[in-house]
Amino acid sequence: MTQKERRIFLIEYLLRENPNYHGVQIPDDEDEQKILLRSLMNVRPPQHTSKEFLRIQDNYLQEAIRQHGITGLADLKPVTGRGNGDWYVWRGDITTLKVDAIVNAANSGMTGCWQPCHACIDNCIHTFAGVQLRTVCAGIMQEQGHEEPTGTAKITPAFNLPCKYVLHTVGPIISGQLTDRDCTLLANSYTSCLNLAAENGVKSIAFCCISTGVFRFPAQKAAEIAVATVEDWKAKNNSAMKIVFNVFSEKDEALYNKLMS
């Protein structure tokens, strides 16, 4: 099957399984088809999926990521003068990064972003991992029986992403003036991810900028906490785990490079 044939199959499957979509027309434009498919995946509840759907979805997503370009750890340049070549700052799409684990800035529901085509990292990771990720996360949350507390972490397979695992953590939401508790909770998110990564044999991990987006944690302070917390954890655990700070903007890239220079 071509990518177009896969995309049409997936859209038709998702439209058929929900009677509310009766009458929805599939657009001819490729970009509009991609938007429709992503939207349908983003709002789809965790439920049974046919083996045929999963096979075609997996082929489609893996090819889409391959076309976008996969970045491996060997493609990154270590930060000079820090550690033993095990610290990196990288600006790019975390869903294309081939490391052992990537970190997802999740919400307390832990089942991904339900807003169609939202640009948050939670949405991107769930979209390109595939519908299996929401199903697995929903199972974890059902067994847990309550929302995910701030500063903790869960680990799942990465499914169609180039990495092996996704670590999901809920960072603090800033609604007013930044407090010491906010800073402690953010540090806890980093520590929880590192502990869980080590328990699962992870040798390389990529952190997004936890809490700095819609959760409104100030970027400068968040970066300081991130670097200090990871550095402290590596020292206490005598760890050679490779650390990638994945950033979105040139400003954040400069900020992390300055902190680690």
From Swiss-Prot:
Positions contributing to ADP-D-ribose binding: 93-94, 107, 120-122, 211-213, 215
One of the record's GO molecular function terms: hydrolase activity, acting on glycosyl bonds
Residues at which Zn(2+) binds: 113, 118, 120
This protein's name: Protein-ADP-ribose hydrolase
Entry-linked SMART domains: A1pp (SM00506)
Any Pfam family: Macro
Annotated keywords: Glycosidase, Hydrolase, Metal-binding, Zinc
Entry cofactors: Zn(2+)
Similarity comment: family membership: Belongs to the MacroD-type family. Zn-Macro subfamily.
The reaction(s) this protein catalyses: 4-O-(ADP-D-ribosyl)-L-aspartyl-[protein] + H2O = L-aspartyl-[protein] + ADP-D-ribose + H(+)
Keyword Transferase listed: no
SUPFAM superfamilies, sorted: Macro domain-like
Source organism (scientific name): Treponema medium
Positions of the Macro domain: 74-261
